[in-house]
């Protein structure tokens, strides 16, 4: 069988963090959907109070045990990789996992308060006003500086690198076509090493009705391609129905940026995959 992006889903969440379905049900749904390379990537623990119950505990033993049991159960039928979506403010290590996704979900102000950039518009307003004195571009700059810091750690996958646009429908907070914004985003992208990190084309916000196109924006994908970077199609699935949600749209979007190939993550590393069969 020829490789296809639909055979791989490596950005997924379960009830062990903020997902809606159990690890068992997510794995079963992936197998039923024809996925051959499935990655479990729950959110890493953070010290943020409002995160508790939505991220893994600091002791990830139970998480690993469930995954290992499922790996044995599906041996010979589907590869299951145990990974971690590691946040910039995590207080645990990503060492020991088959792979990890580097992400930024929070900005921290001088008072020590954390603001989620992807929760809702109200939180983003509070972040802008309280942490950045109303300066939206100072907030954006701080976000992309954190993206660059995560990129410097050489994650196998860089997650939804322009997540700060999630609540920006209709350019509510800033104009995504404006030069000042795009220069900040492109500067962060320059920190990503295309020889060591794969950029995900992530449909998660599409599944939840926040966006009509995947992360990241087309101008970022075009620049990434110009630098010789590779992409992986992901669903950022939080439900068993979302394992490969929006993949056809993500493929078409990547093709607009000039890509003809993505990669698939396997137990033996990355393998190339044509976007079209």
Q: How does the language model describe each region?
A:
Residues 1-88, 98, 165-179, 238-245, ...:
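An N-terminally biased module of ancient metal coordination in phosphate/nucleic-acid-related enzymes
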Residues 5-9, 37-39, 79-81, 98-101, ...:
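Structural preference for beta-strand elements that scaffold enzyme active sites
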Residues 11, 30, 100, 160, ...:
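Conserved, mostly hydrophobic/aromatic
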Residues 58-194:
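Extended substrate/RNA-proximal surfaces in nucleic-acid metabolism proteins
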Residues 167-169, 175, 179, 186-202, ...:
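Glycoside hydrolase catalytic-domain groove-lining segments
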Residues 204-208, 238-240:
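Short Gly/Pro-enriched loop/turn and capping motifs at secondary-structure junctions
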Residues 213, 217-277:
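Long, positively charged, glycine-interspersed low-complexity recognition regions
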């Amino acid at each position: 069988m020829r490789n296809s992006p639909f055979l791989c889903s490596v950005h997924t969440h379960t009830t062990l963090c903020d997902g809606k379905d159990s690890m068992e049900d997510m794995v079963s749904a992936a197998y039923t959907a024809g996925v051959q390379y499935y990655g479990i990537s729950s959110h890493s623990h953070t010290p943020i109070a409002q995160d508790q119950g939505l991220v893994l505990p600091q002791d990830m033993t139970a998480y690993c045990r469930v995954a290992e049991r499922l790996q044995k159960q599906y041996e010979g039928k589907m590869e299951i990789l145990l990974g971690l979506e590691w946040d910039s403010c995590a207080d645990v290590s990503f060492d020991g996992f088959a792979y990890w996704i580097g992400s930024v979900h929070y900005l921290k102000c001088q008072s020590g308060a954390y603001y989620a950039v992807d929760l809702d518009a109200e939180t983003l307003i509070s972040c802008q006003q309280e942490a950045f004195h109303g300066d939206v571009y100072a907030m954006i700059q701080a976000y992309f500086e954190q993206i660059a810091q995560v990129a410097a750690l050489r994650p196998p996958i860089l997650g939804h690198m322009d997540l700060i646009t999630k609540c920006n429908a209709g350019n509510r907070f800033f104009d995504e076509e404006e030069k000042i914004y795009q220069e900040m985003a492109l500067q962060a992208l320059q920190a990503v090493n295309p020889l060591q990190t794969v950029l995900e084309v992530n449909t998660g916000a599409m599944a939840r009705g926040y966006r009509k196109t995947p992360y990241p924006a087309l101008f970022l994908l075009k620049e990434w391609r110009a630098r010789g970077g590779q992409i992986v199609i992901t669903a950022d699935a939080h439900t068993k129905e979302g394992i490969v949600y929006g993949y056809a749209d993500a493929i078409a979007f990547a093709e607009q940026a000039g890509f003809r190939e993505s990669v698939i993550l396997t137990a033996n590393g990355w393998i190339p995959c044509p976007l079209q069969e």
